[in-house]
Amino acid sequence: MDSYFITRVELLDATENDYLRLQAEMDARGFSRVIPNNDGRRRTLPTGMYFIQRPVSDPAAINNIAVEAADKTKRKHRVISFRTDLWASNITPGL
């Protein structure tokens, strides 16, 4: 059974290009900034925040994958991942 994870990556002293690189690295590893909203539409999470669904239960395993992606930016970084089995979202477009 799949688990749902949210991961937040903060790049220190980063440029917009650093976050674009991070986005590409996270995408390549199966992470997405797009998440289903309660209204059935899909919404984009803020920069540096990602969603992933995987058949593992250990947030540390997901966090390690995100750290590998962040390492590719060559910036110092902070990464936190958590598993959530129940969640809801109401992300307003444009915010």
Where are these regions (language model features)?
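A structural detector for beta-sheet-dominated domains
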Residues: 12, 53, 82-83
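Alpha-helix N-cap/helix-initiation sites
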Residues: 16-19, 59
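Short, surface-exposed ligand-recognition loops at beta-strand->loop->(often short) alpha-helix junctions
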Residues: 9-17
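A structural signal for short, well-ordered beta-strand segments
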Residues: 7-9, 50
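Short, intrinsically disordered low-complexity segments
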Residues: 32-75
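C-terminal structural segments of small proteins and small subunits
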Residues: 67-93
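Short structural boundary motif marking the start of a folded domain
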Residues: 1-5
